[in-house]
């Protein structure tokens, strides 16, 4: 398994198709998220925040199939927290060049979750981020606690599509988080995919 960083402009058409299909498989087919269908690519999942401002972390297996992904966007550009989930923040959603949003985080293999998470933080920090924001459900919040991720809640727990969610903010620097207190591999496939 290896990971790569991409932007949409850098991706080949084949890789874009692979990523769109992987996200559709994970979020629409397996999790049942009610997301708008892509107008021209059936079976692919993209939204209005997939722009030239986004960076993507992709994890590949030995057969060059995508097994994990994450999307990173500076909050100075349109993002999911501001555009869709602004109500989850007690105040205005963060908007600063050093604060990035992480969304569409998912893995097919449980053991990839934390390696992909830490690599996503590193990618953002090297690009100038000091903090990461995003939406998690209560299960993912517990998983972050178990794996030593320090975060703060940006607002109260709310309900979206019959699921409890909340907005959080955390440091983009791994050294600000403690070591995991339990192996991350215990995590079920379902739990891994339950993030925005």
Curated annotation (Swiss-Prot):
InterPro entries in the record = Acyl_CoA_acyltransferase, Autoind_synth_CS, Autoind_synthase
Which GO-annotated molecular functions does the record name? N-acyl homoserine lactone synthase activity
Q: What is its EC number?
A: 2.3.1.184
Reaction(s) catalysed by this chain, per the record, are: a fatty acyl-[ACP] + S-adenosyl-L-methionine = an N-acyl-L-homoserine lactone + S-methyl-5'-thioadenosine + holo-[ACP] + H(+)
GO-annotated biological processes: antibiotic biosynthetic process; quorum sensing; signal transduction
Ordered alphabetically, the record's keywords are:
Antibiotic biosynthesis, Autoinducer synthesis, Quorum sensing, S-adenosyl-L-methionine, Transferase
- Catalytic EC class: transferase
Protein name per the record: Acyl-homoserine-lactone synthase
Q: Which organism is it from?
A: Pseudomonas chlororaphis (Pseudomonas aureofaciens)
Whichever gene encodes this chain, its name is phzI
């Amino acid at each position: 398994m290896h990971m790569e960083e991409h932007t949409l402009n850098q991706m080949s058409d084949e890789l874009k198709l692979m990523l769109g299909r992987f996200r559709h498989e994970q979020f629409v087919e397996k999790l049942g998220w009610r997301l708008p269908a892509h107008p021209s690519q059936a079976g692919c999942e993209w939204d209005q925040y997939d722009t030239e401002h986004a960076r993507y972390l992709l994890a590949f297996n030995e057969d060059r199939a995508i097994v994990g992904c994450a999307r990173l966007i500076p909050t100075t550009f349109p993002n999911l927290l501001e555009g869709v989930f602004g109500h989850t923040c007690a105040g205005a959603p963060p908007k600063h060049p050093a604060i990035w949003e992480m969304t569409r985080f998912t893995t097919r293999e449980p053991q990839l979750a934390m390696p992909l998470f830490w690599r996503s933080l590193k990618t953002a920090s090297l690009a100038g981020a000091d903090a990461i924001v995003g939406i998690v459900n209560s299960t993912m919040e517990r998983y972050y606690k178990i794996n030593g991720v320090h975060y703060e809640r940006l607002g109260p727990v709310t309900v979206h599509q019959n699921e409890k969610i909340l907005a959080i903010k955390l440091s983009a620097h791994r050294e600000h988080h403690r070591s995991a207190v339990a192996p991350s591999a215990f995590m079920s496939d379902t739990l891994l995919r339950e993030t925005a």
